């Protein structure tokens, strides 16, 4: 609104009028800075935020809306920097029109996405929305269609990180799940079904714990501050776009851990694969994603010799490291994320195969596991495999086999690389399990694979980091000729 003394015929008056409008846009409800804006300033480097479309307002005149036109229209958009790296950002304001999205709101989101794609920078979306603004009609749904088109276009081009900072429901709940990393804050809910339809409180079926377990959420935060800190942390492992190299930092120290003593002498005894990972990567750099989902496989980022890498590893502490449909799907998406953003992949293998149950078959194991094999074969980044113990049957194939596309495969002397377990081999060959001990000696070791070039080296566990460092240096120059095609269908 113009002040009573503002003279719009003068330059000073016009500047005063602009200042008043911008001040109103920063507190559109007249009650101080909204949480949506505070989240942006907390996320970005101090003083780096440049807002776009701050004076945008809806154009609707139905239902008396012409008298209620707050600036920003309920979403703060713009660009800035995180640790000196340029990013685009948007933050939804759950206080304006109950967090609903209208036509202008959607235009702002598509514009900031277009800006991020055009300039090749990551985009961070902070979500708090209850869905479409019903008063504006079907144009709001068209806005959601445009938004989904943009997040789809951005996928694999620029890193996308989503934060659920407030309740996000209905069709608004879909776009954040397209992100490469999704952070959900405790106490919020993300769901497409209204609570009265689902028959339960939203947090029970759409809260942080539920999404962490399902794998929808990669990270869970206790509050806004931690959520935004996690965004800054994970961004440090990602390049600006699909044309940039994975980040490099100064090489770190190595944890003091004896890898030669990690594998138990008893085959049935488990150990923690995360100990192996932490002993090989730069100290303190392993950043696990999707920790609560499919705990039989570990995924996350790390640095090795200062190079950002993706980690995929069987976890013997859960299901003895056996793969299931959830683990395959979790690993497949992570492998594709690494490949999209030029991040080498290091895999640690200790798995007896797939979980052989009717429930898994009904859960779509074959279809979901095929996604993992496809992702492994399709990935053109450097791929290194370390077989620590079991690589039995399908697990050998799916977990970074040489002929599935791994560039370098290393086996520990404790590795058991075979078609099947010794008891099953005895049964298949001799019709009984009486020859299990002989089959164990004949098949369950790494040397047959090494003789046939299926393992490049059998190495001492304590030498693992050295081999990975040198392998990563070699694979910096890796080039793969791709067969032209539109896209795969798996």
PLM features: what roles do these ranges have?
Residues 1-490:
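Ligand-binding clefts of soluble mixed alpha/beta catalytic domains
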């Amino acid at each position: 609104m113009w002040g009573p003394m503002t003279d719009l015929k003068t330059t000073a008056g016009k500047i005063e009028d602009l200042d008043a409008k911008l001040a109103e846009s920063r507190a559109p409800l007249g009650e101080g800075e909204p949480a949506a804006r505070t989240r942006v300033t907390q996320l970005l480097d101090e003083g780096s935020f440049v807002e776009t479309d701050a004076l945008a307002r809806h154009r609707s005149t139905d239902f008396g809306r012409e008298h209620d036109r707050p600036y920003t229209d309920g979403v703060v958009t713009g660009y800035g920097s995180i640790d000196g790296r340029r990013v685009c950002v948007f933050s939804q304001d759950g206080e304006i029109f109950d967090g609903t999205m209208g036509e202008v709101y959607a235009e702002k989101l598509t514009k900031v996405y277009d800006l991020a794609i055009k300039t090749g920078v990551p985009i961070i979306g902070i979500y708090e929305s209850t869905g479409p603004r019903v008063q504006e009609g079907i144009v709001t749904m068209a806005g959601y269609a445009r938004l989904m088109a943009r997040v789809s276009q951005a996928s694999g081009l620029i890193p996308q990180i989503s934060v659920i900072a407030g309740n996000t429901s209905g069709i608004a709940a879909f776009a954040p799940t397209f992100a490469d990393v999704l952070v959900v804050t405790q106490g919020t809910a993300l769901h497409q079904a209204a609570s009265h339809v689902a028959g339960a409180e939203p947090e029970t079926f759409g809260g942080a714990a539920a999404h962490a377990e399902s794998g929808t959420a990669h990270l869970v935060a206790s509050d806004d501050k931690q959520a935004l800190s996690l965004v800054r942390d994970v961004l440090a492992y990602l390049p600006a776009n699909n044309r940039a190299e994975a980040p490099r930092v100064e090489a770190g120290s190595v944890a003091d851990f004896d890898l030669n003593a990690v594998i138990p002498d008893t085959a049935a005894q488990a150990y923690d694969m995360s100990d192996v990972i932490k002993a090989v990567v730069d100290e303190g750099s392993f950043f696990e994603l999707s920790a609560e989902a499919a705990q039989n496989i570990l995924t996350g980022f790390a640095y090795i010799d200062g190079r950002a890498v993706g980690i995929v590893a069987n976890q013997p502490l859960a299901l003895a490291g056996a793969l299931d449909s959830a683990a395959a799907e979790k690993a497949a998406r992570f492998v594709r994320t690494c490949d999209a953003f030029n991040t080498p992949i290091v895999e640690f293998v200790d798995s007896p195969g797939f979980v052989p149950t009717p429930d898994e078959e009904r859960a779509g194991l074959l279809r979901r596991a095929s996604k993992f094999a496809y992702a492994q074969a399709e990935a053109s980044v450097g791929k290194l495999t370390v077989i620590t113990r079991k690589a039995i049957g399908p697990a050998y194939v799916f977990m970074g086999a040489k002929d599935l596309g791994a560039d370098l495969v290393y086996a520990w002397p404790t590795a058991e690389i075979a078609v099947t377990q010794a008891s099953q081999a005895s049964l298949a060959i001799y019709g009984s399990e009486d020859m299990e001990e002989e089959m164990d000696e004949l098949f369950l070791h790494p040397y047959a694979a090494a003789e046939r070039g299926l393992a490049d080296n059998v190495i001492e566990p304590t030498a693992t980091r050295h081999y990975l460092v040198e392998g990563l240096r070699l694979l910096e120059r890796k080039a793969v000729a791709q067969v032209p095609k539109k896209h795969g269908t798996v």
